[in-house]
């Protein structure tokens, strides 16, 4: 279990404290004579101009001469009209979530209409039965079927889809790691098709990248969702090439409403089983190899990174199938005996036994301090139920404080076995506020408000899903804590923009582009 408390870095911050230090005062007292002698020389008069300009640039930006503000890019590709919401604006988040759900539903239905026969052939007739049950268009024999059997069929169908997706991704990763001469005919075709998609994605990202303003944190935007999904899907399960509707595992699950059926019949919410439309490490690799060909090994790393998220989802579903469903069936039988319920139906009482609080769902949960809420907020990030892990990352932007800590797992109906290790969210939050209160950088009013906030529970502002694996999410959080250069780039602009940048860097990761600029050389007169 880890805990890290650090001061955040911003451009200009180190110079602000350096100008008032004792060492600086000694330098100022001796610099006059040295500068006078130097300026009298011929070389000195030519160099002074560049030196002064370099010094002014350094004082204004807080950089040493070898540093420069670079371009930072969040590693997600937004569809047209999308935007990362402000984490402290629940209304903004809710509106976006609802719009995305409607778009996804429409696109998934297209996949079902286009590939229905092929999907049934590959994954079995059970998918169609589950879909008909959810749509209320069930035939008599399906209507007479027990609800628990429909639930089992939905779980089994989802298991087949995730197994197939996992196998295909591993095949592609293995093919990419082989030498060209050692690949089979099928592997060669698979790699060639994937490379074509990467080239298309690279061209689209390159166009966006060239149009970006320098020295800004930005997202790559503007691709339509259909093109994006087709270009970024490593191995479509049905449909190939750059078709506008490819049957990805995510699309098949959505088209046949498997998660909705599982939720409707058992009360178990599986909306956290997600995979990124485009793997952030793919965007990072494309940006890294702008002017040259991307090696196969680098692509294999990205494929394996996405496969981690798929495997995590698969383990979660197996946990539900092997651990939770037998307990669910037992609870059903007990309730049937007590209440004398019909054998076919699942009583709502049984479902409620497997409901878990919203604040313990595997998502990024957002909280803020009751006072000075714009500056003081934190995220509680929870892993899948089978892993039972979580961490806390808190920010006080007014005094530039960040606090990261691994937390103990919560017990709930869907959780796996756990060890009593680590602290609770409340303990971490109180220590975070205690450290912020003791900081010498805070104003008197800010300190008073923090003391008041410490006596009450934080305000819960809702939650957001994350698409990457929990290990990658934790890696992104730790990079925000440790990487000074990243902090300098995300902590610029208005407060709401900084909060969005922090959330983007946590959910997707962030790539700093460009080489270091030699500022004095750049500013020196020819």
Curated annotation (Swiss-Prot):
Its main location: virion. Keywords: Capsid protein, Outer capsid protein, Viral penetration into host cytoplasm, Viral penetration via permeabilization of host membrane, Virion, Virus entry into host cell. One of its GO terms (molecular function) is structural molecule activity. Signal peptide: none annotated. One of its GO terms (biological process) is symbiont entry into host cell via permeabilization of host membrane. It is found in: Virion. Residues 1-42 are annotated as: Involved in membrane permeabilization. Pfam families: Orbi_VP5. One of its GO terms (cellular component) is viral outer capsid. InterPro entries: Capsid_VP5_Orbivir. Belongs to the orbivirus VP5 family. VP5 protein is one of the two proteins (with VP2) which constitute the virus particle outer capsid. Acts as a membrane permeabilization protein that mediates release of viral particles from endosomal compartments into the cytoplasm. Permeabilization activity is probably negatively regulated by VP2 and is triggered by endosomal degradation of VP2 and exposure to low pH. This is Outer capsid protein VP5. It comes from Bluetongue virus 2 (isolate USA).
């Amino acid at each position: 279990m880890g805990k890290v408390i650090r001061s955040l870095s911003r451009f200009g911050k180190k110079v602000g404290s350096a100008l008032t230090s004792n060492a600086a005062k000694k330098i100022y007292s001796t610099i006059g004579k040295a500068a006078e002698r130097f300026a009298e020389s011929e070389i000195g008069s030519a160099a002074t101009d560049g030196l002064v300009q370099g010094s002014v640039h350094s004082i204004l930006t807080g950089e040493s001469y070898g540093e420069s503000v670079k371009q930072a890019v969040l590693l997600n590709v937004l569809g047209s009209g999308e935007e990362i919401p402000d984490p402290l604006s629940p209304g903004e988040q809710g509106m976006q979530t609802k719009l995305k759900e409607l778009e996804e539903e429409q696109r998934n239905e297209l996949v079902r209409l286009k590939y229905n026969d092929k999907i049934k052939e590959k994954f079995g007739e059970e998918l169609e039965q589950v879909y008909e049950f959810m749509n209320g268009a069930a035939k008599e024999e399906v209507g007479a079927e027990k609800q628990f059997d429909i639930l089992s069929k939905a779980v089994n169908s989802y298991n087949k889809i995730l197994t197939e997706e996992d196998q295909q991704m591993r095949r592609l990763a293995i093919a990419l790691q082989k030498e060209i001469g050692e690949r089979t005919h099928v592997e060669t075709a698979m790699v060639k098709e994937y490379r074509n998609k990467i080239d298309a994605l690279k061209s689209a990202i390159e166009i966006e990248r060239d149009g970006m303003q320098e020295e800004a944190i930005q997202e790559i935007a503007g691709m339509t969702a259909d093109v994006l999904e087709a270009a970024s899907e490593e191995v479509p399960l049905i449909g190939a090439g750059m078709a506008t509707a490819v049957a990805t595992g995510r699309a098949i699950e959505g088209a046949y409403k498997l998660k909705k059926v599982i939720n409707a019949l058992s009360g178990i919410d599986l909306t956290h089983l997600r995979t990124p439309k485009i793997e952030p490490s793919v965007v990072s690799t494309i940006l890294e190899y702008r002017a040259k060909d991307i090696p196969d090994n680098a692509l294999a790393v990205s494929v394996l990174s996405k496969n981690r998220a798929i495997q995590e989802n698969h383990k979660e579903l197996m946990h539900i199938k092997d651990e939770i469903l037998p307990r669910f069936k037992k609870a059903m039988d007990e309730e049937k005996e007590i209440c004398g319920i019909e054998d076919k139906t699942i009583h709502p009482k049984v479902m409620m036994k497997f409901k878990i609080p919203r604040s313990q769902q595997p998502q990024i949960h957002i909280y803020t301090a009751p006072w000075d809420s714009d500056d003081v907020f934190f995220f509680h990030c929870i892993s899948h139920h089978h892993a039972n892990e979580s961490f806390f990352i808190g920010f006080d932007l007014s005094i530039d404080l960040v606090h990261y800590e691994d937390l103990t797992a919560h017990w709930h109906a869907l959780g796996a076995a756990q060890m009593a290790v680590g602290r609770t969210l409340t303990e971490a939050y109180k220590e975070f506020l205690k450290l912020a209160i003791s900081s010498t950088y805070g104003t008197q009013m800010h300190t008073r408000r923090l003391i008041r906030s410490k006596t009450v529970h934080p305000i819960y502002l809702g939650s957001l899903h994350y698409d990457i694996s929990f290990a990658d999410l934790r890696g992104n959080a730790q990079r925000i804590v440790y990487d000074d250069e990243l902090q300098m780039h995300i902590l610029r602009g208005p407060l709401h923009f900084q909060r969005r940048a922090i959330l983007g860097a946590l959910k997707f990761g962030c790539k700093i582009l460009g080489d270091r600029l030699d500022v004095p050389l750049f500013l020196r007169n020819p």
